[in-house]
Amino acid sequence: MLYNINWAYTLARVKKKLYLCKLIIVWSVHCSEGRCYSTSKITIENNINITNSMILIADSGSTKTHWCLMAANGHCEEFFTDGINPFQQTSDAIKNSVNNQLLPQMAHLMWAGSINKIFFYGAGCTPEKSPQVAYALEAIFKSAKIEVYSDMVGAACGVLGEESGIACILGTGGNSCYWNGKEIVKNVPALGFILGDEGSGAVLGKRLVSDLFKNQLSEELKEKFQNQYGITAADVIDNVYRKPFPNRYLASLSKFCSENMDNPLIAQLVYDHFDYFAKRILPQYPAEPVGFIGSIAYYYQDVLKKVLADNGFQVGKILQGPMDGLKEYHKKDVEPTM
């Protein structure tokens, strides 16, 4: 017996409601006594009512953007593209990124045109820079209402929801705020990886390469680093001062720390990295639970929890990304199925 399995998306109208359906077609051929018989079976799954409009949620850091297309019944389709940051990209560059990376992933979704709200949370989305992102999205999603917020608001919504507390981002960059359940009421300026971004991957990478090339770590570690990355001090200077996205470059080097936490010198470097953040930033906020978003917080959470406990802070959620929390937070913004 031979089998052939195909699938496709199609639209179906049932009782005046429009659905996006995934069709799974199983076609088989069975031969017996010189005759062949063909049969087919069609299975419909993932029925999504698209009579009502949907929303698009974006969580964008400096390295990647996580997109979620949410239907009225709560079903989501998720996509990933490069990071979008209006401090580092023009509106045209942002538009090109969305056109070239997001839209091809959504090409099979014939219902993408029914998006009527977009909530974009992004690094660098200050009140002055947010219009750059809005203009780029408006040029593509012409019928959608677009709201652009900072990644800090996204982190607070994602990790705290409607509860009050301290929300922190520790990813490629770093930031923090006090959230009253509805809005940010206090924010210690992040200032970027050169002047601030305490606790971030970029600053951890900066500290690592500085200590390595200034002979503050062992020869064993320096040799291991060189064998893995094969870079010189001149390479670091070129990538940090002459090439785009130096923060991403430095953050990528911080991975060396996570791979060598069994080395006491690296373990101490990482502890001191978070301890500096805890002592310099967190005391400026009310004494409430501290929640974290970001890959650095997530992958170093054992050290982070110890540092916060040593400094007398209560740790809340530590999530790699805010999207699950944002999906829950924005359910109210999707029009209900009629």
Predicted regions and their residues:
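Glycine-rich phosphate-binding/hydrolytic loop that grips phosphoryl groups
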Residues: 157-163, 297, 302, 306, ...
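Conserved phosphate-binding catalytic cores of ATP/NTP-utilizing and phosphoryl-transfer enzymes
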Residues: 144-168
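Adenine-nucleotide phosphate-binding core of ATP-dependent small-molecule kinases
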Residues: 88, 230-286
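Glycine-rich phosphate-binding loop plus the immediately following alpha-helix
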Residues: 184-230
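Phosphate/pyrophosphate-binding loops at sites that engage ATP/ADP/AMP, CoA/4′-phosphopantetheine
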Residues: 100-116, 280-288
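Short glycine-rich, Thr/Ser-proximal phosphate-binding strand/loop in the N-terminal lobe
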Residues: 55-94, 184-185, 190
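Short beta-strand-loop/turn "lid" adjacent to the catalytic site in phosphate-handling enzymes
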Residues: 87, 106-147, 159-160, 239-243
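Glycine-rich phosphate-binding loops at beta-strand->alpha-helix junctions
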Residues: 121-128, 267, 281-306
